[in-house]
Amino acid sequence: MKVLSYGSLNIDNVYTVDHFVRSGETMSSLKMEVFSGGKGLNQSIALAKSGVQVWHAGAVGKKDGDFLLEQLEEVGVHIELISKLPVKTGHAIIQRNREGQNCILLFGGANQQVTREQIDHVMEQFSDGDFLILQNEISEIGYIMQKAHEKKMKIVLNPSPMDEKIFTYPLDYVDYFILNEIEARDLCGHDGTGDELLELLAEKFPMAKIVLTLGEEGSIYKDQEKVIRQPVFKVDVVDTTAAGDTFTGFFIGGLV
């Protein structure tokens, strides 16, 4: 069984701030750091650290993407399916406040240049029963899902960032949804408690397994037979950046 993480690769510019910048405000940051990032990359690193052999597919810029490839290789992620394109690598501007909370502005760059030709080549390497991990920061997600379904791969979707494109994807092909309450509300088109959202998702996607993350309240898993509630192990928060991606990687790592 192989795991394919088909997702974004970003250069994260992280600014530590006293508070998030308000409209019209100019403010000095307390610190500036540069990290590897992107939901796809974060999930691949978490998968690799969970002990899983993972192949990452996606795209970076020829001039500024080597840093990200080196980061993936360091933890054992296979990078031969990543394309290097004559465009800028995707990047993010992240504000992180004193409490460790963040807000993020994305530039898609090479992440939005994934082509069907590349996808066809990547999918030739995988087969029945392999896992595909997806989020919503790259182009051609719907086509990737279609090809994975034809291969009888197990499709895991983290519908983040949540936007109108999600509803154009063949969501009935998804085997696992991993999402937070905000994403669940948007996907269902309804407000509600965690339990209510879980039931709505199960009605909408009866064949899928649902993992709903609830922040400091933990998470809930639901499939056709059972519901499992998992509380959190409390720690002092340093930075919430990539927390959801790390959860996704280790959850799937536990299945594989």
Identify what each model region corresponds to.
Residues 3-4, 164, 194-256:
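Conserved phosphate-binding/catalytic region of the ribokinase-like
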